[in-house]
């Protein structure tokens, strides 16, 4: 009986429930320059460790491998230019593959989760390698470097703790560092070019099959492609297109093309520069034998760009310049890699939450903390990279886990596009997708065959994720909703007349509620005194980064939110007792301040009542004050009252 009454109350309240963003389009405020900077913050970090790993794999015969990695990177970039042209609302693997089947989309998303997990761990480790190299003589830095796995764990836990407050302004560090990094890379190439030589290049020593395995082992420069595909949903539209018929073909092309060119050419030139280091290491480090040079290069595989800066800077200008420039490279890439690690954590939170909103993950994953961040996805996004770092034996063990996730996700994406008949791809687009699908499919199979640790890792991620999905689907439709006796007692046959808003000509007062605080009593007294309609607004803040795609649909029913239900039920009852017309207004939003402003203006209220901020100093620093933001932008026609 209680559940039937609750359903009746829910249906009757549908007319008075508002959703933030209903009938609106997500703001498209990311221009191509910002999108390119965000893409570079992910894609541009690959050169920091790809060339060093290539040398470890094949020594002075590694240039063909580096060039092959660059070629595949360029090929994937062309694929995603086409994908972004046809998916203006988000073309990541989860969105693109969903048209071919929900299970396929979930598999693609879980492969991306595996990639983001290793990206966070690997970027954190590499960041510490870049900042601590060359300072081993300092005792505490040597301690950090000797226990780099534990140090990386602490860094990842710190990033997870920061994300407890939400992802506001996430990615700003990557944007700020994009141009300095490009400048550093250009200077690095400039001091290296005079010393480039083919003298030390060697022919391959292995069979073609062994060369293929070596190539597969260092194909680490692909994960940025998914990030730009997810950004199309918030990119500015092309001139002449509309929100109803969006197009971001030109904007996405301008964002992808320069970054792809920089990544491809920069990685190729710096790889050649690495193989030309023996020409100067005899002068700077007095190393002449091939074995000594190879040992020195292998020892610096994790921070190869610093070694290139140090050696060529010393020979080209002066020893002091080589030392200073090496530290500049280390500091810039430290922050860029740290930002990439944080971005991976944020993206994983958003991806898990989006899957949950689509009914693919347990409902518990939607539970938010006080800052609007989903608790379980935050725990998973922060915990998985830590677990991987603690389990991995060394940097190379982390590298072995990396490619299988991102290559699998991109394979699912381009494969889905090649078979997608709902999108008007040209025949040569489909041919491009098919060729890329076959190449990356072969890479994925080779990774599974030659890297058992990577295969075990991806099976664990897929197995755990699909098990959670199976549990979720089994529970759908079987969970009953239980309400308290107090709520059930309020649902009577007279509820229709009780809840129907009795709007009259006159003033309207809106009060924004976050809990059963004294501001609600004050609002009731004001409404009774002025004989005004009282609009009780409850905003459920969701601090989620969706990776650029449109936010998933959210059921905006206050009856489904226990705290909102308690407040609204109490206010309806108290309003009825005092003869006040109470109008419940429920909104789900990423930005509480903007939602309050929009609804206050839309509903034409005369007074807006807010409670004094109860946030801590740290929360205000990271997220700002709602009352302050509202006061700065509220129209003059609406009077603001801050109570408390």
Features from the language model and the residues they span:
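Membrane-interface "cap" regions at the ends of multi-pass membrane proteins
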Residues: 1-50, 78, 95-97, 211-215
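Helix-loop-helix junctions that connect adjacent transmembrane segments
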Residues: 25, 175-230, 236, 272-276, ...
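Extracellular loop-to-transmembrane helix junctions
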Residues: 51-109, 118-155, 262-266
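Selective recognition of specific alpha-helical transmembrane segments in multi-pass small-molecule
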Residues: 68-75, 179-194, 249-281
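Loop-to-transmembrane helix boundary motifs in multi-pass membrane proteins
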Residues: 103, 145-153, 236-266, 353-390, ...
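C-terminal membrane-solvent junction of multi-pass transporters and transport-like membrane proteins
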Residues: 173, 205, 364-375, 410-452
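Extracellular/periplasmic helix-exit of transmembrane alpha-helices
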Residues: 240-245, 257-311
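Small/aliphatic-rich secondary-structure junction motif
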Residues: 501-561, 574-576, 583-585
């Amino acid at each position: 009986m209680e559940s039937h009454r609750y359903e009746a109350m829910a249906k009757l309240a549908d007319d008075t429930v508002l959703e933030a963003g209903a009938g609106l389009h997500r703001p498209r405020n990311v221009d191509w320059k910002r999108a390119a900077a965000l893409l570079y913050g992910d894609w541009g970090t690959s050169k920091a460790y790809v060339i060093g790993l290539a040398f470890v794999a094949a020594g002075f015969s590694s240039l063909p491998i580096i060039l092959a990695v660059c070629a595949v990177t360029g090929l994937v970039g062309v694929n995603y230019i086409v994908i972004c042209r046809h998916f203006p609302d988000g073309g990541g693997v989860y969105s693109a593959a969903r048209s071919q089947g929900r299970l396929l989309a979930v598999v693609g998303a879980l492969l991306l989760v595996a990639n983001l997990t290793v990206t966070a761990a690997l970027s954190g480790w590499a960041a510490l390698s870049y900042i601590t190299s060359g300072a081993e003589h300092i005792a505490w830095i040597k301690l950090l470097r000797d226990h780099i796995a534990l140090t990386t764990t602490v860094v990842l836990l710190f990033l997870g703790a920061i994300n407890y407050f939400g992802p506001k302004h996430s990615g700003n560090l990557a944007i700020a560092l994009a141009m300095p990094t490009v400048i550093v890379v250009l200077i690095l190439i400039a001091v290296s070019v005079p010393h480039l030589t083919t003298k030390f290049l060697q022919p391959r020593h292995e069979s073609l099959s062994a060369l293929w395995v070596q190539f597969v082992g260092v194909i680490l420069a692909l994960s940025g492609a998914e990030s730009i595909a997810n950004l199309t949903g918030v990119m500015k539209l092309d001139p002449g297109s509309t929100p109803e018929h969006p197009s971001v073909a030109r904007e996405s092309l301008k964002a992808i093309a320069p970054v792809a060119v920089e990544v491809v050419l920069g990685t190729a030139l710096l790889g050649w520069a690495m193989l030309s280091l023996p020409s100067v290491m005899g002068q700077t480090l007095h190393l002449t034998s091939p074995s000594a040079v190879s040992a020195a290069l292998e020892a610096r595989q994790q921070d190869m760009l610093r070694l290139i800066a140090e050696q060529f800077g010393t020979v080209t200008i002066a020893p002091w310049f080589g030392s200073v420039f090496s530290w500049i490279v280390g500091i810039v890439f430290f922050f860029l890699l740290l930002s990439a690690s944080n971005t991976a954590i944020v993206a994983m939170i958003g991806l898990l939450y989006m899957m949950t909103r689509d009914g693919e993950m347990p409902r518990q994953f939607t539970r938010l903390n006080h800052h609007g961040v989903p608790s379980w996805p935050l725990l998973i996004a922060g915990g998985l990279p830590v677990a991987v770092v603690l389990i991995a034996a060394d940097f190379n063990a982390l590298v072995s886990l990396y490619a299988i996730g991102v290559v699998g996700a991109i394979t699912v994406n381009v494969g889905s596009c090649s078979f997608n008949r709902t999108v008007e791809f040209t025949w040569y687009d489909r041919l491009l997708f098919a060729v890329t699908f076959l190449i990356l499919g072969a890479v994925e199979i080779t990774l599974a065959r030659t890297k058992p640790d990577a295969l075990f890792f991806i099976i664990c991620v897929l197995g755990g994720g699909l098990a959670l999905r199976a549990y979720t689907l089994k529970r759908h439709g079987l969970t009953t909703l239980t309400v308290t006796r107090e709520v059930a007692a309020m649902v009577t046959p007279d509820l229709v007349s009780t809840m129907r808003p009795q709007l009259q000509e006159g003033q309207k007062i809106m009060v924004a509620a976050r809990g059963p605080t004294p501001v609600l009593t004050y609002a009731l007294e004001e409404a009774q005194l002025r004989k005004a309609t009282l609009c009780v607004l409850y905003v459920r803040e969701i601090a989620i980064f969706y990776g650029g795609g449109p936010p998933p649909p959210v059921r905006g029913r206050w009856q489904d939110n226990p705290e909102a239900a308690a407040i609204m039920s109490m206010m309806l009852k108290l309003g009825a007792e005092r003869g006040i017309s109470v109008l419940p207004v429920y909104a789900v939003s990423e930005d509480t301040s903007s939602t309050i402003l929009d609804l206050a203006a839309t509903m034409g209220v005369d007074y807006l009542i807010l409670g004094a901020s109860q946030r801590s100093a740290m929360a205000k620093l990271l997220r700002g004050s709602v009352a302050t933001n509202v006061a700065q932008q509220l129209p003059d026609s609406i009077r603001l009252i801050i109570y408390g």
